[in-house]
Amino acid sequence: MPVDRRSLLTLLAGGLASPAMAQSSSPNGAAMSRVTAYAFSFAGLEGDAIRLADFTGKPLIVVNTASLCGYTPQYAGLEQLFMRFHERGLMMVGVPSNDFGGQEPGGVAEITKTANKEYGVTFPLAAKAEVVGPNAHPFYKWAASERPLETPKWNFHKYLVGRDGHIAAVFATQVEPMEARVVDAVARELTRIE
């Protein structure tokens, strides 16, 4: 029996399109896949909103921070990374969180003292927020949907958002900000053309 190529192509195209159609009609399907980091905002530590949309097209590191953590000295490395690449377009937002070990119990004054005065941080800091669980900030819920196996397990978990607004790389707590793999990933994103 001869095969009608047009019928076969139509059948194949229909079979391939069906899952895509089903995904786009689902509430968490294609519509969610179009959401990028640039859709979110954080309340700023000192009041002004930090709108990630203002960073559209620029690589962005979002890192959950804590003042009383053994990893708190990473603020210095984060600032060094920020200063190294900021003029080329890197943006960074620190998100103080008390989620892990209660290591960010203070308010604005304590967070500012640690980040700005002790470590010289110049990148924006958000208001204290939850980064895990049902009350997590919407950015962190989105990041968990983008990278479900790479969610924060402790303070100083780093998301690198690429120029396209999607997560390009994730660096766990123990990865120092100035390690070659972080520096290389940031440099790659800065040279990437959209």
Where are these regions (language model features)?
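N-terminal secretory signal peptides and thylakoid transit peptides that target proteins
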Residues: M1-G15
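N-terminal "domain-start" segment that seeds a small globular fold
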Residues: Q23-A53
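Terminal helix/beta-alpha structural elements that buttress the NAD(P)+-binding lobe
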Residues: Y38-A39, A127, G162
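Short active-site neighborhood of thiol/selenol oxidoreductases, capturing the structured segment around
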Residues: F55-G70, M92-V95
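Structural microenvironment flanking redox-active thiols in thiol-disulfide oxidoreductases
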Residues: Y71-A136
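Thiol-/selenol-based redox modules, centered on thioredoxin-like
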Residues: K141, S145-E194
